[in-house]
Amino acid sequence: MKNVSRLLPLLPGIALLTGCNQKVQKDNGQNSQKPNIIYIFADDLGIGDLSCYGATKVSTPHIDRLAGQGVQFTNAYATSATSTPSRFGLLTGMYPWRQENTGIAPGNSELIIDTACVTMADMLKEAGYATGVVGKWHLGLGPKGGTDFNGHITPNAQSIGFDYEFVIPATVDRVPCVFVENGHVVGLDPNDPITVNYEHKVGDWPTGEENPELVKLKPSQGHNNTIINGIPRIGWMTGGKSALWKDEDIADIITNKAKSFIVSHKEEPFFLYMGTQDVHVPRVPHPRFAGKSGLGTRGDVILQLDWTIGEIMNTLDSLQLTDNTILIFTSDNGPVIDDGYQDQAFERLNGHTPMGIYRGGKYSAYEAGTRIPFIVRWPAKVKPNKQQALFSQIDIFASLAALLKQPLPEDAAPDSQEHLNTLLGKDYTSREYIVQQNLNNTLAIVKGQWKYIEPSDAPAIEYWTKMELGNDRHPQLYDLSADPSEKNNVAKQHPEVVRELSELLESVKTR
């Protein structure tokens, strides 16, 4: 029996939820007609970063092909403007701000999804799917108190519904810089144990702060701890030298692991949850992409990301799996340009606009924080088209359960709504509202033409990245139909709309 016992509210007035009270029912029916499902989370990719969304300074032909063969959304949203909470929301179907400890996770964080909760992977596994996760994880590993990377790490992704796990524990700018496969660090020498700490230095490995002469990619802010591959990271580590990744090889390794999972399960329905490291910092493209975009390393890793998507598509083609595979491509949050390294991302933009026409970006309550590229392809069932309806990533869980006619416990995926026909481009009915969350847990709500951002005493500007966070002590209201760039706060002109949306947001919090 699954239940969630540690869901504690972060914000005043937020109702305590119980999550999932019981296991989903096993589907023992025929699997032959069930579609394969691949969900690909790019990292920090903006709606303006792809040529199918209007970018003119960089070309993404593989993703463009995916969009041309599927449903391309223009009003799709991540649940949050940072990585960990967006991933939490997708897999649990619950707004991350309802639970403590769902902010940006350090590399030695405990698993933040309760193993008693029914996840989307649980649901699909019970529906007869082989389930796998490959790539960026960033939801913690191990028990409360921190991760021991030197033995079998448990709980892990296999504890919450995944049959197979090959993951980057956190982000590529955070230690430990190793891969974990089915609970074990890949290539670890037991005579060279790993120690990780996010509070103080451990061991004698050089750091960016103490040994700047050893750094090949200098930090612009924040990244001055243990140096791995000439790149200073967030956090300190020592040991595990034989297990350390090479940054320029990460995309190849993740892509090949994803392809291997597909090949291994080609005869049965499978669910692959794939998290790329691109285009997150540090941006270290493979040599075959380095210098090819004309936009510096950020542009180069966009090309690398596009190659990754092309490899997945080509694998499906070669196995004749394309027609009956639902392939969803999106980003965990909006873009950021300078996120901690002196990689000339600003200087090399050359007119490229990662945020598109939208204000803000990663970390922000403004539109570019959570309005993301979102493409769905299923050739057997879905006709190519453009989708302008409001849609949230949090609704993937309930929508896939509806597609598979898979019953859920009453309290599973409490915030996920079934919008299957919208997801598949068969109708254009919008979600009633979208809730957005920024770095500081400030919430915004979009309904119809209006967007309301609740008052907040948090900083207006993120200290390190200089990103506008959307925080203001006064209510903010924007008419997105007339002002999609959120230039004019019209809260004073429309107090009745402010009151309506404020009350709606409060009702969502306490639901």
Curated annotation (Swiss-Prot):
Keywords: Hydrolase. Pfam families: Sulfatase (PF00884). PROSITE patterns: PROKAR_LIPOPROTEIN (PS51257), SULFATASE_1 (PS00523), SULFATASE_2 (PS00149). Its EC number is 3.1.6.-. The conversion to 3-oxoalanine (also known as C-formylglycine, FGly), of a serine or cysteine residue in prokaryotes and of a cysteine residue in eukaryotes, is critical for catalytic activity. InterPro entries: Alkaline_phosphatase_core_sf, GAG_Ulvan_Degrading_Sulfatases, Sulfatase_CS, Sulfatase_N. GO terms for molecular function: hydrolase activity. It comes from the Bacteria. SUPFAM superfamilies: Alkaline phosphatase-like. The keyword NADP does not apply. The modification 3-oxoalanine (Ser) is found at residue 83. Belongs to the sulfatase family. Exosulfatase involved in the degradation of the glycosaminoglycans (GAGs) chondroitin sulfate (CS) and dermatan sulfate (DS). Catalyzes the hydrolysis of the 6-sulfate groups of the N-acetyl-D-galactosamine 6-sulfate units. GAG-specific sulfatases play a key role in the persistence of the major human gut symbiont B.thetaiotaomicron in the host gastrointestinal tract. This is N-acetylgalactosamine-6-O-sulfatase. It comes from Bacteroides thetaiotaomicron (strain ATCC 29148 / DSM 2079 / JCM 5827 / CCUG 10774 / NCTC 10582 / VPI-5482 / E50). The lineage of its organism: Bacteria, Pseudomonadati, Bacteroidota, Bacteroidia, Bacteroidales.
